Amino acid sequence: MTARKILLYPKDKEALRAKSESIHAFNKRTKQLIEDLKDTLIAHTDGIGLAAPQINVHARVVIVRLKAVSDGSREADPPIALINPEIVEAGDERRDFDGCLSFPGLYGETVRPHYLQVIGLDESGKPFDRTFEGFDAVVVHHEIDHLDGVLFIDRIEKFEDLYRVYVDDDGKPVRVPVSQIVGVGKEAIRISDVAE
């Protein structure tokens, strides 16, 4: 088991913003990368997706745990790998919960497709053409964004949509807008300033 260090924003901003290269040979190194990504995701039990750039490997590989729900009320399936994933169709855009292991404790509401058709290779190196719907589509879209250096904060439309989640005395999650935490109006601060 090799859990790798997850890059954090803004410290590792340059690496997280870099675009990833396609996998051209499905070999032992690719298999090891997939295992490292899975081990890293499993070690971070609150995560449902991880992209290779988040462990400082700029290859087009993502790991996702499907069948999760945005409120965390259902345990996700075991992680699967998508290699060289390419979105061929997207639709049904909606606002939904978004977060990222590279931004610990920071969450937001973003607009993402709730329908995706994706082609690529599975973890055996075999081609796939797969449809993802609902929150699964949100997760897959988020992870594919990482491969192009796009981060979830880039998709935040309003400062008020960015928040931290705390657990109250009853053990229930409470969303606190970042604007309340930093104590300044949205005119005085950009979303990227909060993340940095």
Regions found by a protein language model. Give the residues of each.
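Active-site rim/adjacent substrate-binding subdomains
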Residues: M1-H141, H146-E196
